[in-house]
Amino acid sequence: MNSNNKRVALQEISNYVSKSLNVKGWVNAQVREISLQNGCSPSDKHFPSQSWHGISSIEESQIQKDYDSFLASPLEEEIVFTEKQLLVDLDVCSISNVQSPNCSVSEFGIAIEESNDNCAEEDEEEELQMRYSADESVSVEYAKEILSHMEKLEIRFMPDYRHMSAQPYYVTEMRASVINWIVGVHTCINLLPESLFLSINVLDRFLSLQNVPASKMKLCGATALFIACKYEEIHPPTVKDLEIVLEGEWIGEDICGMEKYMLMVLQYQLGWPGPVSFLRLLTIVNKWESQLRIMIKYFLEVSLVEQRFSSLRASQLVATCAYTGQSILQEENWSNTLPQITGYDYMSLVSYVHLLLKCLENPFDHHYAIYSKYATPYFHGISRQVHDWIATNTNLMAMDGS
């Protein structure tokens, strides 16, 4: 075997995490605080649920209503994605440089054009087709079928948010701590983005089907990442690598046993498309700059920590993060192509935008590992930019969503 192709040993993962990001120490402190709250052990104490801070009661009910509507949708339901939105009309009219009169302004000050069967829209469809054709990784002739299949899968593999929200309070708190730990490990091993999002989907689906004691939450998180890596990576980490990451808390036999059990509970169903697929499609269509793409990725990872975002489809989550990023960067328009591809307009995303902004207020308590990751020069310090923007827009953060 060629030594150049040999996978680099992961001996420095635990040291890097604990010394550089200090994720391990932060997670352990969170676990101890939760476990000792009120002098009770998380295994025998059901803490009361927290109230929904930062969004109104109307938005809270809307989030639950949206989730219920997803469950009510049959898997065989076809996407409203017509041939007109993908195929070029040969008789397209020239686009006008004048702003459409059918335009409203959002509370963020961004012009939102309403869909209209006019010449500008037809010309935009032609441009969309040209952008598809320019990217060799996109098969234009199969785009409609691929999107339709992805839409069905994202509904099929959604976790049961109602069961997760009914879990004891310590489960929600420890889930956030474990996800921050997973992000730190994922960053150190330099895994694919798909592996991270799939691992959280596997973990959430497992938590929505099984009651997990606090003592095994970290083992479940590590195993979920292990399963996702086997599905997505060319060179996934080994059991020995995970033992090093877990620093002796669990041995290989425990990891393999949990892996078998989780796959059995999930019936070996791992085909969740995830937000990365939708993000890449929207990036091709909209020609987004790198700053906006990185910001959306940051928001997507932040949403992993907040359990309430598990009630969203992957495509809806991407649309929420995209609109928030466009708002912060003061993009001129809420692009018509985004509603065309995802099927979500601005008004259907308001509640989730407010929830995301609330999560971004205090990154050091909510998503320490993710903030540290995106504060590095590699990601252009995007998390610091977002934090500075929020600090100077306190009036926006005080909105009640009415």
From Swiss-Prot:
This protein's GO CC annotations: cyclin-dependent protein kinase holoenzyme complex; cytoplasm; cytosol; microtubule organizing center; nuclear envelope; nucleus
Domain of life: Eukaryota
InterPro entries per the UniProt record, alphabetical: Cyclin, Cyclin-like_dom, Cyclin-like_sf, Cyclin_C-dom, Cyclin_N, Cyclins_cyclin-box
GO biological process, one term: signaling
Signal peptide: none
GO molecular function term, any single one: cyclin-dependent protein serine/threonine kinase regulator activity
Family: Belongs to the cyclin family. Cyclin AB subfamily.
Record's function text: Required for pre-meiotic DNA synthesis and S phase progression. Regulates levels of meiotic intragenic recombination.
Identification of the protein by name: Meiosis-specific cyclin rem1
Encoding gene (name): rem1
